[in-house]
Design a protein with these regions (language model features):
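Glycine-rich, acidic/polar active-site loops that bind/position phosphate-bearing ligands
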Residues: 1-198, 204-524
Length: 524
């Protein structure tokens, strides 16, 4: 016909029993609720610690947000050893290196296509993971395995931010496939190697009658204070409620596999503001950090580092803004100065607080991984969940936090419970029907490869491997295997036991792979 053809994607809402129940509507309601409540608070109490902003001039609240998309790209049906990846990562051979060949072509095309969709791509670059591409005898790239990141302009509409993130994933995958490359957005596609995050930025601004926009997180003097009273309150609110929020951010085993000590993967509920207001924080080991430019107050925002490419950005932003508002409400109504609020945020473990948990610390300027032991991290910032079930319990065991998050019915309690139920169901299905079968395939593949029975070292090493294989996967008359016990626990609804067995399974599989590699390297 000569007419253009293509796919039209229209973001939509879902109504059930005359009620909107979808993620987009939850985010819209949450922003509408926070906007109305914050405007009312400002009208009644003013803006403490912000004398440069006249409260009676504020006519609207603007929510700024943005996401960063990390992903792995590879040639189909070609493999690279984990050891090669691990060594390259430790040497940081790929971080911010120039892209080459097909990967460069696809990355440039993806950035250009994002621009054509109006997303205003800002940057595409290599991340820490990956190895140098290998060429075949004809000079073509035969093996590609690299980690990349693409960023685009922030939005003043959180719904647009989340819509853009979904659209960007689709575009990136299609462009790289057009160039013969596979893309994965999994949080931890390769255990032991850097995973992919989706750092989520958020801020709150006020529009004045004059049309001017001011950043409510920025203080009057950027060189004397790191953040305004409302900015301090916002991070207090997020950190206080994060245990109940966490299941909505990291809802899968894959996402939790990424959140372990290592390459900038946050494991502790803690923030950093910077050692001095004149020097912005560069701490990349914390959960949520203050991002600021001393010469540009409009740039002040927070960066939540725990989300991954498959995090539901709609519900994540909804809970971020609701929890931040609760802290901002405390900052406005408590009568405390900015210095007092910052001191409260910076309290030590055991120090009482009017808003935060007495038995927690919430701020550090130190490296969370290098400067604290595991025991110190647990004592100061709480124990990070190791499984989806442990994460769900953070929601179930904190009803007072959930009640706050459900305020105004923007994200109603029954909808939260429904999300949690779906997270639990997915955990069980993936564990029983994907992770355990995959581990079983790995166990079956680790067979004896030595033929010289006179070598006692080989015999001993494979005997250790075989003992682990039998413990993990082989039932006998007097003992069930670990895999069987885990499946039984899931079927019986014994989720505490299943969670413990999953942790044991992960540890045993790691031990098995290490022992088998040690055995195999001695074979000629």
């Amino acid at each position: 016909t000569g007419l253009p053809t293509g796919t039209l994607r229209i973001p939509a809402f879902l109504m059930h029993n005359y009620r909107y129940v979808d993620s987009r509507s939850i985010l819209k309601r949450s922003c509408d609720y926070v906007r109305a409540e914050l405007l009312a608070l400002i009208k009644e109490h003013g803006l403490p610690g912000m004398p440069h902003v006249k409260a009676d001039e504020v006519v609207d609240i603007i929510f700024t947000s943005a996401t960063e998309l990390e992903f792995w790209v590879k040639t189909p049906s070609r493999t690279v050893t984990k050891k090669e990846l691990s060594v390259s990562q430790k040497l940081q051979e790929q971080y911010w290196q120039r892209t080459h060949g097909t990967v460069r072509t696809a990355l440039e095309q993806a950035v250009e296509r994002l621009d054509r969709y109006g997303m205003v791509a800002e940057m595409g670059h290599k991340e820490v993971g990956g190895v140098k591409a290998k060429l075949d005898e004809d000079g073509h790239e035969a093996v590609v395995l690299e980690q990349l990141e693409i960023d685009w302009k922030f939005s003043n509409n959180p719904l647009q931010t989340a819509d853009n993130e979904l659209q960007a994933r689709i575009i990136v995958r299609e462009v790289f496939r057009e160039n013969g490359l596979d893309v994965t957005f999994n949080a931890k596609p390769i255990i032991g190697v850097a995973g992919s995050g989706e750092h989520t930025h958020f801020g709150v601004m006020a529009k004045l009658k004059s049309g001017k926009v001011v950043n409510l997180f920025s203080p009057e003097d950027m060189r004397k204070e790191s953040a305004s009273s409302l900015g301090i309150g916002a991070i207090m609110g997020l950190l206080k409620h994060y245990e109940a929020i966490n299941p909505f951010i990291s809802s899968t085993t894959d996402s939790l596999n990424r959140l372990k000590p290592g390459f900038e993967a946050p494991v502790c509920i803690v923030t950093s503001l910077g050692t001095d207001p004149s020097e912005p924080s560069r701490n990349r080991t914390i959960l949520c950090g203050l991002i600021r430019d001393i010469d540009n107050p409009m740039a002040t925002r927070y960066e939540l580092r725990s989300p991954n490419p498959y995090t539901n950005t709609y519900t994540a932003l909804a809970l971020i803004f609701i929890s931040a508002f609760d802290g901002m409400k405390y900052a406005i109504t408590s009568g405390k100065t900015q210095a007092q609020l910052e001191a409260e945020l910076s309290k030590e473990v055991g120090e009482t607080s009017d808003y935060l948990d007495t038995n927690r610390a919430y701020r550090t300027e130190k490296d969370v991984f290098d400067d604290f032991t595991q025991e110190e991290r647990n004592q100061m910032f709480g124990v990070a969940p190791a499984t989806v079930w442990e994460n769900i319990k953070g929601y179930q065991n904190n009803p007072e936090l959930v009640e706050t998050l459900a305020q105004g019915n923007a994200f109603a309690k029954d909808l939260m419970d429904s999300f949690i139920a779906s997270i639990l169901k997915r955990w069980k299905l993936v564990l029983a029907n994907r992770l355990i079968p995959n581990n079983l395939d790995t166990v079956r593949s680790m067979v004896a490869i030595h033929t010289d029975s006179r070598n006692s070292v080989d015999d001993k090493r494979f005997a250790e491997v075989n003992d682990l294989r039998f413990y993990l996967a082989k039932d006998s008359d007097d003992r069930k295997s670990l895999f069987t016990r885990l499946i039984d626990a899931l079927n019986d609804g014994e989720y505490d036991l299943a969670s413990q067995l999953q942790i044991e399974m992960n540890d045993k599989m790691e031990e098995l792979e290490t022992k088998y590699a040690n055995y195999a390297k001695n074979i000629f």
